[in-house]
Amino acid sequence: MIQLFHVTKAYGGDAPVLSDVNLRVEKGEFIWLTGPSGAGKTTLLRLLFCAEAPTSGQILVGGRNVNRLSQGGVPYLRRNISVVFQDFKLLDNRTVAENVGFALEVLGASDAHIRGRSLRRLDQLGLRSKADSLPARLSGGEQQRVAIARALVNEPALLLADEPTGNLDASLTDSILELLFDANARGTTVVVATHDRALLSRYRRRTVSLDRGKVVSDA
C-alpha cells in the first residue's frame, strides 16, 4: 500500500525534516508513527497525501508513484485516502452532517445515502445532536470528532491520522480507536501519528519511531 525509498524532505537551506526514510506498509496494516515533536511525523503524512512533494526519493501509494502524478492524478488518488490533520479543515459554511458527507458527495452518492451514512458516523461519535449545526458552534474537541467521522464515512483504502485523539478524554479516545480498529478490520490501511506513549502501550501494533527525521526503530 505504501512504499518510501530514500525519501528526504528539506525546506530551503535548513536541516532536512526527513532524511533518507525507507518504509513499507502493507495493505491492511495498522501502524503507529511515533517520535518527539519535530521528528517529522506530520511531514511524512503530508507527503503520503501529496500535500507536499519530497525533495528526493520516491513514494508509492497504492502502487502509484506520487512523484509522477499529473495535476489531475492527485485528486483521483485522494479519493481513496482519508486524512485527519490537526487543523481539521472543516467547511465553515456547511453543517456538521454536510462536512462529514462531503467525501461521499464528491463520489456522486445520492443525498439519502450521504445523509444516512453521515448520521450513523456522527451517532457513533456522540455528535448526532450536532448534525445540523455549523462547525463554529462546536468546541475544539467536537470539531476533532467531526473530522474523524468525515475520514471514516467513505471507508477509504488508506487513512492517515495526525494525533487524532490529542485533545480528547480517555473515554472518547477509546471510542475513536475502536472505530479506527474496526475500519482496519474491514480492510482500511491505517497510519496514526502520535507521541502518546500510553496509547502505544495499551494498544500494541507495529510502531515506527522517528527522531530528527530518521526512522530509528520499526517493531
Predicted regions and their residues:
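Short helical segment in ABC ATPase nucleotide-binding domains corresponding to the A-loop/adjacent helical element
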Residues: 97-105, 115
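Conserved catalytic motifs of ABC-family nucleotide-binding domains
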Residues: 155
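ABC ATPase NBD coupling module
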Residues: 12-13, 66-82, 183-185
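Conserved ABC transporter NBD signature motif
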Residues: 57-65
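Helix-to-loop junction immediately C-terminal to a conserved catalytic motif
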Residues: 49
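Catalytic Walker B motif of ABC-type/P-loop ATPase nucleotide-binding domains
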Residues: 159-162
